[in-house]
Amino acid sequence: MADRRRRLRPGTLAPVREGVNCRSRCFTKHKNGLKFPTSLHSRQLVFPRKGLDDFRKGCPPCTGLVTQVPVEGFLPQIYHRAPQLAPKKRQIKLLKEADVLSKLSPAQQARKAFLEDVEAHLTPHPLALYLNLEEAMPIELLSKVLEVLDPDRKLEDTWAYCQDTRKGMKEPTKLLKKHSTQVYLGPSKKTSVSNAGQWLYEEKPHKMDLLHENGPRPGLHENGISDIDEEFILKQFDIDYETKPSHDALHTMKLNQVPLELKRSVGLSKLQETEFFQKLGYERKLQKPQNPYKPKWVKMRYGAWYLNPKLWKKQRVDEPLVDPEVSHKAQEENFKKELQEQEELLADLHGTVAFKDFILSRGYRTPRFLENMYIGKECKRACNKTPIKRTQA
């Protein structure tokens, strides 16, 4: 035990002489050990030149394909300090002609451009559906619409129309001298057009002003006599039926807003009009608004207690209750009538006649359905031939 304790005591080891191999497993040396492979040496690796796999601007040039050794090492570099971030490179802006990140060859890009050009010529212009767009829109709004939808100015007529009208509006117009004693006919109407949250107003000339441009305006003479006659007043209320109908927009009107001339053409008098409108209002009050989400509730029944439950049938309560035996008999009669009608149609056909002649020529037994068919037909003919006896009164 004492010897064992001495061995386990900590002590200093003597230095090992040079050239002496240590028997410990941790320091064993292998004479035929594996050498470091040269393929993993970063200085001997060879890489292709940068930019050979970039096909964004087309195929790379065939010249200068010499490979070169990378400047940086293959193995990771260990920094004793925090590594500095590399400066960000500016993204190279490609030309408009070259598609961004496109993998197409120049021939494919040319074909794609040709197809887009053909489709652009074939597709109709967005303003081609609106024929009366010039008359319906004010000039300022029409010019803004054209700038958005037709930037290339393909619609030359509409652009010329806008420019001509703008020039006419800018030119000074001749104002008529208005006398203080002339009749005032009211301000001009304003038509509002909503566009992108803004209201644009276009002042349209009044119909009465257009009438006075052609003829003299009524006024007072020096004697105090006015030119306003009965004919002049009737002309003001005259309706022009030769105006262009606007098919683009549908103007809905209520029954109260219908003009008197249309009511007279229909033939409604004043009393009939009041009764008609009163009936409409009363009917609307009686009609309750139906909720489409709630289905209509219908009461159903399946039969009576005194009938056989096997013969019950689902039906509504308001429908009359029919005896199932009677309904069964009626169905049988209807079925027999349909069969008779079909037999009559088949008996007149050429196929059935030829089939009957074939059976008789061969001496076969005629089937029962053919016999019944022709028996019924002969009975019908006999009934039609027999004269009806008239009883003398």
UniProtKB/Swiss-Prot annotation:
Keywords: Chromatin regulator, Chromosome, Coiled coil, Cytoplasm, Nucleus. GO terms for cellular component: chromatin; cytoplasm; nucleus. Residues 326-354 form a coiled coil. One of its GO terms (molecular function) is enzyme activator activity. Its main location: nucleus. GO terms for biological process: protein localization to chromatin; transcription initiation-coupled chromatin remodeling. InterPro entries: FAM47. It is found in: Nucleus; Chromosome; Cytoplasm. It holds the Pfam family FAM47. Promotes histone methylation by localizing the arginine methyltransferase PRMT5 to chromatin. Belongs to the FAM47 family. Interacts with PRMT5; the interaction is direct. Interacts with WDR77. This is Protein FAM47E. It comes from Homo sapiens (Human). The gene is FAM47E.
